[in-house]
Amino acid sequence: MHGDVRTDDYYWMNERDHPDVLAYLEAENQYYEHMTAHTRPLQQQLFEEMKARIKEDDESVPFKYNGYWYYTRFEKGKNYPLYCRRNNTMLSPEEIMFDNNEMAIGHSYFKQAGYSVSENNELAAFGTDTVSRRQYTLQVKNLKTGELYPEEIENTTGRAIWAGDNETFFYTRKEPQTLRSNQIYRHRLGTSVTEDVLVYEEFDETFDVGIFKSKSREFIFIGASSTLTSEYRYSRANGPDFNFEIVQERTRGLEYGISHFGDYFYLVTNADGATNFKLVKTPISATTKDNWEEVIPHREDTLLEDIEIFEEFLVVEERREGLNQINIKRWDGTDDYYLDFDSETY
């Protein structure tokens, strides 16, 4: 630029698989091992102290989804989690869907990016990374037989969203160099990955894309977001055409998140100067901004952070004077209260 030519003497290190780069890294590792050899007893001591403070046989709080209780647990002396579930009640026999300790055998690195279970509770899509590059290979497991389907979809975020037919799922691909999530594909179980349909592609390099299903399981949303702007598309989860329609076209500075309940979409948004955000709703049949109806107005002293929708309640996460608050409202208007916690700084 401006006649100033500069040489990057380290550009060759950009090729992570080049023999010279690998040799350099190996030499650096050997140098480190040599220079820190005298600290190995201390390293082991610190490791044991930190491990002693960890509950090795830990278990997550279970959550119920579509008739099953799902949870993650660890076993003492093992490094990786087990993803489990129980049918209808936590007293039912445990089903181990994924044992990452077994799956990690033979790999110097292993990470599973969660899982997504089909509507009939029989299939689970899951992503694994064995390189530590956050480029997950997506696969499908039959939870009844333990069989893995032959499809392997590479360079994904590792998560899939099932349609209602138990055969179709959507997934997100990454741009290979930058790892920006930029493409949404549709796959039909039992078909070649080469036949997958590109549903959406984001060309603006300042935006990432993702896909998720509404809590009601009736809609699938594609979201595109940058630092200051967001945009969503929606389709019925049961298809069959999966034509995604825009909720509200992106406008720089306009942010909104989306949920579904009944005949409406509910949006947490900063529209119309709502710097602390407000809650609006819009009919599913008319989603553009001119149809938005205010549910919770903007408040100068309260930041509206998020909402959670239940069959009988709307739960609102707020922050006032720097403290978190949880407001619970009945849909029928008969109750509206804040949860009382023992400490202000919960």
Task: Give the positions of each predicted feature.
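Charged, compositionally biased N-terminal leader segments and the immediate start
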Residues: 1-3
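Peripheral, non-catalytic segments that deliver or gate enzyme domains
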Residues: 5-12, 16-41, 45-68, 72-96, ...
